[in-house]
């Protein structure tokens, strides 16, 4: 998969920093179509803060505008945990082609089981898939080499569709 040149140019302009400093970016998809498939926002925030202390790149939030409250929670937890990387928020502000171009420019996507995970695989951006709740990564991917899957080490994982996870990892 490749984005047309006009979208690649748009993505580079979107990700460019004031003062001409260009960051390396990781994309973060904190939402999911089902709350049971989503890692807790606080976990995202703390993980990103730890990551930012060892890496000088930026964090790009992607998703739909309906996920803005979740993103706000992640950013709040990120700042409380001492996160210091640059942040950009593209959630609700991209077309599909623009999202593909942004993902192609990122070094990594940290995500729940989502559609953008498969787009990132398509543009050869490495993925860390947080496979929680009723998600079975063997059925949903990410497919291909160079990606990582994190799933709770629980006897009951993955949960059934009708269950409410008592652990909600």
Where are these regions (language model features)?
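A short acidic, often aromatic-flanked loop/helix-cap motif at beta-alpha or helix-coil junctions
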Residues: 5, 95-98, 155-158
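Histidine-centered active-site/metal-ligand motif
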Residues: 29, 118, 147
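Donor-binding and catalytic core of enzymes assembling or modifying cell-surface/extracellular glycoconjugates
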Residues: 40-133
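Flexible, glycine-rich phosphate/dinucleotide-binding loops
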Residues: 35, 68-69, 96, 136-137, ...
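Mid-sequence helix-capping/hinge segment at a functional interface
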Residues: 1-36, 75
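Nucleotide-sugar donor-binding patch of glycosyltransferase catalytic domains
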Residues: 75-76, 86-90, 121-169
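Pocket-edge structural micro-motifs
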Residues: 30, 63, 91, 151-152
């Amino acid at each position: 998969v490749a984005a047309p040149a006009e979208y690649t140019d748009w993505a580079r302009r979107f990700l460019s920093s004031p003062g001409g400093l260009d960051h390396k970016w990781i994309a973060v998809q904190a939402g999911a179509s089902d709350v049971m498939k989503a890692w807790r926002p606080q976990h995202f925030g703390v993980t990103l803060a730890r990551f930012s202390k060892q890496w000088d790149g930026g964090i790009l939030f992607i998703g739909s505008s309906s996920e803005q409250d979740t993103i706000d929670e992640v950013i709040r937890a990120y700042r409380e945990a001492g996160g210091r990387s640059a942040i950009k928020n593209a959630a609700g502000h991209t077309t599909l082609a623009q999202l593909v171009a942004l993902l192609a420019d990122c070094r990594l996507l940290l995500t729940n089981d989502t559609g953008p995970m498969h787009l990132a695989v398509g543009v050869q951006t490495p993925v860390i898939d947080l496979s929680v709740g009723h998600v079975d990564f063997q059925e949903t991917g990410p497919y291909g080499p160079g990606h990582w899957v994190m799933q709770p080490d629980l006897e009951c994982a993955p949960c059934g569709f009708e269950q409410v996870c008592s652990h909600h990892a």
